[in-house]
Amino acid sequence: MKITILETSDIHAYVSTKSFTNPNKYENHSLSKVKTYIDEIKRENENVIYIDNGDSIQGSPLGTFYKNNNDLKNLAYVYNLLNPDAVILGNHDFNYGQDYLKSYINYLYAPVLSANTIDKNSFLDIRPYIIKNIENIKIGILGLTTQYIPHWERPENIKGLSFKSALETAKYYLPILKNEEKCDIVIVSYHGGFAKDIETGLELTAQTGENEGYELLYSNLDFDVFLTGHAHKEISGIYNNIAVAQPGFAASKVSEITLY
């Protein structure tokens, strides 16, 4: 059986190809182009899982326009057209406050995941993981978010929330997915990047805990696919026997992983 996994990340509300600064110019990146590509993949392949890895609603002039005009329903409508199987929370998804984020989550058709975001008031409809069944194959999708959000975000935007280590959270949930849920394939979708070189382990940035990708990848935890983001890098390859991807930002690329 062939299973195709698609990932977008850090779209930052770049919906249209039309330039925000020049009305006569069209960009090479946009959700409209992403949708065309995803639709093509789905036409050509029977078993496709598509995950958006977060930072969806903030970052472009259009995102600001939607916020200022309280027009979130139309932005969510665009994302629903892509029909993701799961959406992960990114750090910038908290920038406009929890009421705005809650509305976005409620408008989405897809489940929203972040296992290490702890909501003591249960205000946001978020889950740690979901399970997809494709014929006789059971696929677990675990969502994780960078734990560093309190260092950036306004306190009023994350009131009642706490953010745990992605690594420590994965240590808890991955055995559940493999041993209790009996998943054949486990995908970890982490809105975070790598603070160490993915091959050599050399430190690239300060080891603050913002980006736990390297630690997750080499943790000896049992998972098969590692989708990353946050750092706006392009990563594609097999590392430590795990398929790893990161698709850049602003809807410029789509990561594609094929499992047989």
Model-derived features with residue positions:
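Acidic, metal/ion-coordinating pockets
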Residues: M1-Y260
